[in-house]
Amino acid sequence: MSTNAELFDRACRSIPGGVNSPVRAFRSVGGTPRFIQRAQGPYVWDAEGKQYIDYVGSWGPAILGHAHPEVVRAVQEAAVHGLSFGAPTEAEVELAEMLIARLPSLEQVRLVSSGTEATMTAIRLARGATGRHKIIKFEGCYHGHSDSLLVKAGSGLLTFGNPSSAGVPPEFVAHTLTLEFNNLAAVDAAFSQHGAEIACVIVEPVAGNMNLIKPAEGFLAGLRELCTRHGAVLIFDEVMTGFRVGPQGVQGLTGVRPDLTTLAKVIGGGMPVGAFGGRADLMAHIAPLGGVYQAGTLSGNPVAVAAGLATMRLIGEPGFYERLSAQTARLAQGLQERARAAGVPFSADAIGGMFGLYFGDRVPASFAEVSACDTEAFKRFFHAMLERGIHFAPSAFEAGFVSATHDDAVIDATLEAAEQVFATLRA
């Protein structure tokens, strides 16, 4: 049996940094990444056979818990009939119809293979439909790794403290206006100066890539009003929040309807599926109907779509989100209570099946506030919890995820471990 350290050393010889996505490398917390061998329900097991309660959840998709038998069965049955056709299938039509039925803002939807593809194409579509070039995004909001969006982005870029990425020419981001999240006045000012040039505003309606930051009261409604007034397209990036925080995502919780929505993660059930969709008049600009090009060899892959369909059916059962939200809130509140009892500056927040942990006295509301949290305290907390078999995201700037299989016993075990760890942090 290889150890995690042996596997990481081996990986570093053939894979840049030893990982296929930067945050997995443990660079911001130090130490050796855990190489996961298998997963079931709320648990993962590493290469050394150690079991962990998992709050990474594949970074969001594992809303049903790992390896749900009905999802696994759907994948197996689909694979028997072929892994990829490069042609339309009835299953992809069924998934599109299901997404449209669940999200009132979707009139038409196009399937892709990742969240990055979805957001990249949604922005291209907004530009093509409006004939404008500038876009507005927000500090700390991550919309995938396409060039024009790697400006003060969240996720791994926050982990490494980079405001942007090498390899992105200044000309590529010249049309990207980056503003403070939750600062509606700044958006109003940008529209006052550049209104006729702005194609779209793209936003994580609940930011999940600079930890978890909720929208301020009126922020999303204000974006909707400004976009409508100036003829810009409002894009909700619900790659992370879509069907994770509620049955209609953040747009269902707030009643704010975007023009376009991007989705991924949960809709693939752990397989690579993304989507973008919205108003039919906008979607009519996408090839083959219009001049905005988008294509993908594996878009609508039948095996991935089978996983998505099975997942979407299961999360549509009555009471699913009420139970998920209650368990997530119980975890967040329990952690906060135990930290404060130990005298550790700490706050927690939750929405649906997502939560945020902050080593500071209050829940942050912006990129600057989350950046001011105590990352050294988080490192100590992360490793102490990992030693006790609790697997949180290896970054102070990532949201956490609870699944339907995180029952009372799992939450209790997590809180018991946290109580021990907070006592050591105080010492």
UniProtKB/Swiss-Prot annotation:
Biological process (GO), any one: protoporphyrinogen IX biosynthetic process
HAMAP family named among the record's database cross-references: HemL_aminotrans_3 (MF_00375)
Reactions catalysed, as given in the entry: (S)-4-amino-5-oxopentanoate = 5-aminolevulinate
Pfam families registered for this protein in UniProt: Aminotran_3
EC code(s) of this entry: 5.4.3.8
Keywords annotated in UniProt: Cytoplasm, Isomerase, Porphyrin biosynthesis, Pyridoxal phosphate
Lineage: Bacteria, Pseudomonadati, Pseudomonadota, Betaproteobacteria, Burkholderiales
GO CC list: cytoplasm
EC main group: isomerase
Pathway participation: Porphyrin-containing compound metabolism; protoporphyrin-IX biosynthesis; 5-aminolevulinate from L-glutamyl-tRNA(Glu): step 2/2
Subunit composition and interactions: Homodimer.
Alphabetized InterPro entries for the sequence: 4pyrrol_synth_GluAld_NH2Trfase (IPR004639), Aminotrans_3 (IPR005814), Aminotrans_3_PPA_site (IPR049704), PyrdxlP-dep_Trfase (IPR015424), PyrdxlP-dep_Trfase_major (IPR015421), PyrdxlP-dep_Trfase_small (IPR015422)
Protein known as: Glutamate-1-semialdehyde 2,1-aminomutase
Name of encoding gene: hemL
Protein family according to the UniProt entry: Belongs to the class-III pyridoxal-phosphate-dependent aminotransferase family. HemL subfamily.
GO molecular function: glutamate-1-semialdehyde 2,1-aminomutase activity; pyridoxal phosphate binding; transaminase activity
Cofactor(s) recorded in Swiss-Prot or TrEMBL: pyridoxal 5'-phosphate
SUPFAM superfamilies registered for this protein in UniProt: PLP-dependent transferases
Cellular localisation: Cytoplasm
Modification type N6-(pyridoxal phosphate)lysine: residues: K265
